[in-house]
């Protein structure tokens, strides 16, 4: 009887302890014990949420495991949350996965709202993503794009079979971000790409402990925790290798005239107090270096892949875009970023692709 009584208390604590207040809550679909409404999200949560909003309205309450979640599906509701009451909703739930992989969630995306977040956001906007800084990486973007096109030509000439563009786009995104963030392409050092790919994959993996805390032990049994620990360790080893290489190079004061600074250089200057009055710690520096990889790799190649897919599905659109490119390239060896302001149809194609296939259809909670 004692084990049964303890088990009943355990269930009550985990699943049935609720607030007894009489606050009016948004409409909500019926939830199941333990998992709440998780089963209703399916493989495409944004589509499932859209269907649920048709039934329960533009503002509804879901329970993802033990976590209550408000879902806003109309312009008015989103404006009220993100603009009118921005400070009320400015924080986000703690993510155990981000804590373990991103040094206690010290990056811009996952750090809690507060003075630290305001400082690193300011650093990111003013020093890492300013127009001047983005333009300084133009040569890297154009060179890697040319390399990809040349490789595509070689693959087309040497084989009669179909070419997998996804792999090419993936390497394009990875190489550009490597050069922008870390200063060069790291393809062989301690298997950098495999480690970074695992990092991005794990960051988007469902972690049962975040939603059903009393089932967190499942991760230990399945070996998931060990996998996360190994990736975190490999990631830290790689970032330490990159940072130490930059510090040694800077100490030697090697001639870098005309060479643009990468993100590691900028963050090291900030850490030394040369750029701002907010010196950042080593873990914060490494966390900020991971943001371009977590936010910029799969989003880039996914959009490129879907753009090509839609153009192949719509030959007339493909022909119209080809005519635009050929018109600009008549007297030029190649198209550059200077031509983008005149490529109106290309911009329309990209916007339509983003509308049909948004790489991140849901905002971070």
Curated annotation (Swiss-Prot):
Gene3D superfamilies: Cytochrome P450. It holds the Pfam family p450. Keywords: Heme, Iron, Metal-binding, Monooxygenase, Oxidoreductase. GO terms for molecular function: heme binding; iron ion binding; monooxygenase activity; oxidoreductase activity, acting on paired donors, with incorporation or reduction of molecular oxygen. Its EC number is 1.14.-.-. Disulfide bonds: none annotated. The keyword Heme applies. This is Cytochrome P450 71A3. The gene is CYP71A3.
């Amino acid at each position: 009887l004692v084990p049964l009584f303890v088990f009943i208390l355990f269930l009550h604590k985990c699943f049935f302890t609720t607030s007894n207040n009489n606050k009016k809550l948004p409409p909500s679909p019926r939830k199941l014990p333990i998992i709440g409404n998780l089963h209703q999200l399916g493989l495409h949560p944004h589509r499932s949420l859209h269907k649920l909003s048709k039934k329960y309205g533009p503002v509804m309450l879901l329970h993802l495991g033990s976590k209550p979640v408000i879902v806003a599906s109309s312009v008015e509701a989103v404006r009220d949350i993100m603009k009118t009451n921005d400070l009320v909703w400015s924080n986000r739930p703690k993510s155990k996965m981000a804590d373990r992989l991103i040094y206690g969630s010290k990056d811009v995306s996952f750090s809690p709202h507060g003075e630290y977040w305001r400082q690193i956001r300011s650093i990111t906007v003013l020093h890492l993503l300013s127009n001047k800084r983005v333009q300084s990486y133009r040569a890297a973007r154009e060179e890697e794009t040319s390399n990809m096109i040349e490789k595509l030509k070689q693959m087309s000439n040497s084989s009669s079979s179909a070419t997998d563009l996804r792999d090419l786009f993936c390497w394009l995104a990875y190489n550009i971000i490597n050069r922008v963030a870390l200063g060069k392409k790291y393809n062989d050092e301690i298997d950098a790409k495999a480690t970074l790919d695992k990092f991005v994959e794990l960051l988007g993996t469902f972690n049962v402990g975040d939603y059903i805390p009393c089932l967190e032990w499942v991760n230990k049994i399945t070996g998931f925790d060990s996998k996360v620990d190994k990736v975190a360790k490999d990631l830290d080893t790689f970032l330490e290798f990159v940072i130490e290489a930059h510090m040694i190079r800077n100490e030697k004061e090697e001639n870098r005239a005309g060479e643009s600074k990468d993100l590691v250089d900028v963050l090291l200057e900030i850490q030394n107090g040369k750029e701002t009055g907010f010196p950042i710690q080593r873990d914060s520096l490494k966390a900020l270096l991971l943001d371009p990889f977590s936010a910029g790799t799969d989003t880039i190649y996914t959009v490129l892949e879907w753009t090509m897919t839609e153009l192949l599905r719509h030959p007339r659109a493909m022909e119209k875009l080809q005519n635009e490119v050929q018109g600009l390239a008549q007297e030029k060896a190649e198209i550059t970023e200077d031509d983008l302001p005149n490529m109106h149809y290309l911009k329309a194609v990209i916007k339509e692709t983003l509308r049909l296939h948004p790489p991140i259809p849901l905002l971070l909670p």
